[in-house]
Amino acid sequence: MKSKHRFIQACFRQPVDRTPIWLMRQAGRYLPEYRKTRAQAGDFMALCKNTELATEVTMQPIRRYGLDAAILFSDILVIPEAMGMDVRFATGEGPLLDPPVRVHGDIEKLIHTDPEDSLDYVMRAVASIRKALNEEIPLIGFSGSPWTLATYMVEGGSSKTFGLVKGMLYDAPESMHLLLDKLADMVAAYLNAQIRHGAQAVQIFDTWGGVLSQPTFREFSLRSMKAVVDRLDRTNSAGERIPVILFAKGCNAMVEDIAQSGCDVVGLDWTSEIGPLRERIGHKVALQGNMDPALLYASPERIAQGAREVLQAFGPHPGHIFNLGHGMAPDMSPDHVEALVRAVKEEGLKIHQGVA
């Protein structure tokens, strides 16, 4: 069954009328309407857990920009919370997780819960957003990768050195594998629940895969992501195929390995040229990306030029979803995002109509 949505078509490398665009963190603090809604919620996790408000912030960039896909508004750290950890977001400090997972016994205490129960607020949001979208564009569900989740759980929050989690990886690999296996089980169950409730594509964010060497990335990150992909429901109850996107920041050198994971789309950061990467793996998977997010600090004219450069580098071939190479930052201009979306739509149409 072929989808009517150009985003889904592009995920499966089918012909499209123009290149689809969505943006990581497209719902966020750079939007004044988001800041107003977050203030109404009280704090970030309260916003994630309020069905009406989570739906509202998901829809805000769709109404403003006419993007080609919506992405569920939530946070990757809902999984550690569901497994028994206390997760809070301290102002100016980022996430704090307590108690941190430091030894084998800590890992054994983590509980595998049914996301239909422990993360029921996410499922309500998925269903609510699907209704609000009214089938006009598809909804992307998401999760953090097992490795990225493990970094927060072992470090107890964000880290610059990743000393604790890497120490476990090197000194106690059996403990790290147990943690990653538990997380892979939970991530797969979580994404399958999102699919049951209406997610039409899913993305796994491996934000911290790039801090690993290539051998350790294969063993400790990619292996666990593949375990998740292998367990995902790739067709929903309506008979629609569900594309799977893997985005591993800082891992463009590993694209061949990632393309063999079973995913449909490989997300790229901005550090490599998309044209040569398409030549290497574009016959296997679609590619998502990969404009430097910092271009949004430039003038609208330079932003449009940057968008054209990415689109022209990929060319008129099937299988490209335009995105940034990482998420939106809070201090980016909504007007500059509008200039980007407009440029991608105009140039993406020309490329696929053969007039670029």
UniProtKB/Swiss-Prot annotation:
GO MF annotations, alphabetized: uroporphyrinogen decarboxylase activity
Coiled coil: none
Gene Ontology annotations of biological process type: protoporphyrinogen IX biosynthetic process from glutamate
Cited SUPFAM superfamilies: UROD/MetE-like
Annotated PANTHER family: METHYLTETRAHYDROFOLATE:HOMOCYSTEINE METHYLTRANSFERASE RELATED, UROPORPHYRINOGEN DECARBOXYLASE
Subunit record text: Homodimer.
The protein's name: Uroporphyrinogen decarboxylase
Organism: Magnetococcus marinus (strain ATCC BAA-1437 / JCM 17883 / MC-1)
UniProt gene name: hemE
